[in-house]
Swiss-Prot record:
Name of the protein this chain belongs to: 26 kDa periplasmic immunogenic protein
Coiled-coil segments: none
GO CC, alphabetical: periplasmic space
Organism domain of life: Bacteria
InterPro entries linked: 26kDa_periplasmic_antigen, SIMPL/DUF541
Subcellular location: Periplasm
Name of the encoding gene: bp26
Gene Ontology BP term (one): DNA damage response
Length: 250
């Protein structure tokens, strides 16, 4: 065999090997796709309810005076009384949190159709917010009454929550998985196939929805409460969990 023929055969062999090398991954991928088992994907829903065991109050004290200093002093005195009353009612320091202090001038706008006259400052207002966690729901009405008496005149809202809802959420998870399994079995039976093992599962949990009392409703409750008592209806909180589950088909 001459040199030219030998070179031709070597080049041909290299080309065949190169084509084969590129063909193997594609063949393996195609083979893997054709051998992957059929699957059923479903979404399961689970819900649990629980009675609230804690109230979160958002209150504010507002005071007005001729000067900012006078308004601040009056606001501080009122807030100190409110905090002292909270502690006497059994509220721990960890459950009391004061928020921002807002100082605003009070303007009087002249009756000027052309808007040429400048407004004048007649005083100042100072407000301080307070967040209170009440762990004994039976005391919520009493604490609200005392707060208003001592100086809380701005608000505010009331949320009824669960301090530790972990057990309730876990039960909702179990219900969601059970719901997914039931759905998958129904689909498999309808399709005339068998349901295999779980190959994938993921949770799509939604944050719990506490029982809120809107700000306007809260003010109405405070204003209309007879005999110094604010009625509180605890109701129930709902906890919802969704899961995506993928099953093999036998």
């Amino acid at each position: 065999m001459n040199t030219r023929a030998s070179n031709f055969l070597a080049a041909s062999f290299s080309t065949i090997m190169l084509v084969g090398a590129f063909s193997l991954p594609a063949f393996a991928q195609e083979n893997q796709m054709t051998t992957q088992p059929a699957r059923i994907a479903v979404t399961g829903e689970g819900m649990m309810t629980a009675s609230p065991d804690m109230a979160i109050l958002n209150l504010s004290v507002l005071r007005q005076a001729k000067t900012a200093r006078e308004a601040m002093t009056a606001n501080n005195e009122a807030m100190t009384k409110v905090l002292d009353a909270m502690k006497k009612a059994g509220i721990e320091d960890r459950d009391l949190q004061t928020g921002g202090i807002d100082i605003q001038p009070i303007y009087v706008y002249p009756d000027d159709k052309n808007n040429l006259k400048e407004p004048t400052i007649t005083g100042y207002s100072v407000s301080t917010s307070l967040t209170v966690r009440v762990r004994e729901l039976a005391n919520v009405g009493k604490i609200l009454d005392e707060s208003v008496t001592l100086g809380v005149n701005q608000g505010g809202d009331l949320n009824l929550v669960n301090d530790n809802p972990s057990a309730v959420i876990n039960e909702a998870r179990k219900r969601a998985v059970a719901n997914a399994i039931a759905k998958a079995k129904t689909l498999a039976d309808a399709a005339g196939v068998g349901l295999g093992r779980v190959v994938e599962i993921s949770e799509l949990s939604r944050p719990p929805m506490p029982m809120p009392i809107a700000r306007g409703q809260f003010r109405t409750m405070l204003a209309a409460a007879p005999d110094n008592s604010v009625p509180i209806a605890a109701g129930e909180n709902s906890y919802n969990v969704s899961v995506n589950v993928v099953f093999e088909i036998k």
